[in-house]
Amino acid sequence: MPKIAVLPGDGIGQEIIPQAVRVLKAVLAETDAEFEFQDYPIGGAAIELVGKALPDETLQGCREADAVLLGAVGGHQWDHLPASERPETAALLGLRKGLNFYANIRPVRMIPSLLATSTLKENVLDGVDMVVIRELTGGVYFGEKGRSDNPRSAYDKMTYSEEEIRRILIQGFETAMLRSKKLCSVDKANVLETSRLWREIANELAKEYPEVELTHMYVDNAAMQLVRNPKQFDVIVTENMFGDILTDLASMLGGSIGMLSSASLSGTQGMYEPAHGSAPDIAGKNLANPLATILSAALMLRYSFGMEAEALRIESAVEKVLEQGYRTGDLAQAGDKVVGTIEMGDAVLAAL
């Protein structure tokens, strides 16, 4: 029986994960598939429970699972801890490294009924449909770092191996093959040696994918182009820090970061989570938007279990709910039906 490790985490994670699980169970109930759902603590909740953000039991449970569904981690009450012990570092980076989730996939699509929610013009956004692929376990976030005194200074080392670059670029090419056969590799090869190696390997791999149109773009230009003309992009592939920044920027192309789903893949497993954080300011108030988490559950069915029809059912239900005018506060405009977290989950279930 396939096993899903469920990690609600902190803040609104405790509210949005139950809605995604409800939707998953409803869809799976109409198939012959039987799944086991097992909850584990992570993040600040785990610190309070056992004294560490990523308990051994949680890491082992995730290793034994076929897929991981994660809510969000972090909160101001743990900011006093050393950086290496905070939920965002110890839990998220530890999980990514421990399970070798090296590829982060974030679909960005403007749903027509949400065009008015973005700060960008409708003619710029209408038709936006792209995938951003971010390398997740290398680069400056995982490099050697430190500080010295007299005078005070700090350093963070960025390193990439050929293997790390090659495997994420292959993910980019393979994804492009399934879509419009257009791949934009984003780097900073005019300044960074790691980016020059990245570009070399991308050009080498392009010979193995002659059907894919490969282009290169510097990250600063990519940020500008995502706002100026986002429809030029179909698949973007980039390194860890650049991807971290660009995916948050791209989230506004879909109306709200509350709509941005995410899949993190290894060769054998997947972890699925919304792109937003734990939002402690609205936690426990039934205000959080669960749609990114529900859409992440759809990605789980697609990537980890090959259940494309069921994934499409969830995505269609989300679109239907939005077309009916249901909105959580982050998406609300005048005249919309503003609902809470639970009510939005109810609406998606009804739309199924």
UniProtKB/Swiss-Prot annotation:
Reaction equation(s) it catalyzes: (2R,3S)-3-isopropylmalate + NAD(+) = 4-methyl-2-oxopentanoate + CO2 + NADH
Site positions (Important for catalysis): Y141, K188
Binding of NAD(+), residues: G277, S278, A279, P280, D281, I282, A283, G284, K285, N286, L287, A288, N289
UniProt-annotated binding residues for substrate: R96, R106, R134, D220
Pathway the protein acts in: Amino-acid biosynthesis; L-leucine biosynthesis; L-leucine from 3-methyl-2-oxobutanoate: step 3/4
Cofactor or coenzyme needed: Mg(2+); Mn(2+)
Matches recorded under InterPro entries: IsoCit/isopropylmalate_DH_CS, IsoPropMal-DH-like_dom, Isopropylmalate_DH
GO MF: 3-isopropylmalate dehydrogenase activity; magnesium ion binding; NAD binding
Keyword NAD: yes
UniProt superkingdom: Bacteria
Keyword Signal: no
NCBIfam families: leuB
Annotated family: Belongs to the isocitrate and isopropylmalate dehydrogenases family. LeuB type 1 subfamily.
Official protein name in the record: 3-isopropylmalate dehydrogenase
Species whose genome carries this gene: Desulfitobacterium hafniense (strain Y51)
